[in-house]
C-alpha cells in the first residue's frame, strides 16, 4: 500500500475548502492507495499525474519504488492548469 504525502501548497488549499469537499478529496486519496495507476492520468507535456475528484484536480508525483504518492498541488479544474 502506498504512503500519501501532501505538500504545504496542497495542504493550504485543503484547509480553505469546506468540510464536505475536503472529506471527499481525502476519501478519494485513501481509495487510490492500493493501486493508484488505475485512477491516475499522465500529464501531457509534464512529469507526473493528475487525479480527478469532482471539479477538483490533484497533481501527483508517483514513486513506485518507494511506494509513495506525493500530492503536489490541488485546485479547481478551470484554474489548476494555469501555472
Question: What are the language-model segments listed below?
Answer:
Residues 14-17, 29, 43, 67:
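Generic leucine side-chain signal with a strong bias for well-ordered alpha-helical environments
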Residues 1-5, 16, 20-23, 53, ...:
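Enriched for short, Lys/Arg-rich terminal
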Residues 17, 31-35, 59:
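Histidine kinase transmitter module recognition
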Residues 11, 50, 59:
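Short aromatic/hydrophobic contact patches that present stacked aromatics
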Residues 27-52:
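A short, surface-exposed loop/turn module that caps and links secondary-structure elements
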Residues 6-10:
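Basic, amphipathic "hinge/linker" alpha-helix immediately C-terminal to the N-terminal HTH DNA-binding motif
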Amino acid at each position: 500500500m502506498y504512503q500519501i504525502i501532501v505538500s504545504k501548497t496542497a495542504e493550504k488549499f485543503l484547509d480553505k475548502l469546506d468540510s464536505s469537499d475536503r472529506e471527499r478529496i481525502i476519501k478519494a486519496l485513501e481509495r487510490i492507495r492500493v493501486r493508484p495507476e488505475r485512477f491516475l492520468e499522465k500529464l501531457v507535456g509534464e512529469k507526473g499525474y493528475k487525479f480527478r475528484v469532482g471539479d477538483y484536480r490533484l497533481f501527483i508525483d508517483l514513486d513506485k519504488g518507494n511506494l509513495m504518492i506525493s500530492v503536489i498541488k490541488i485546485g479547481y479544474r478551470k484554474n489548476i492548469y494555469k501555472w
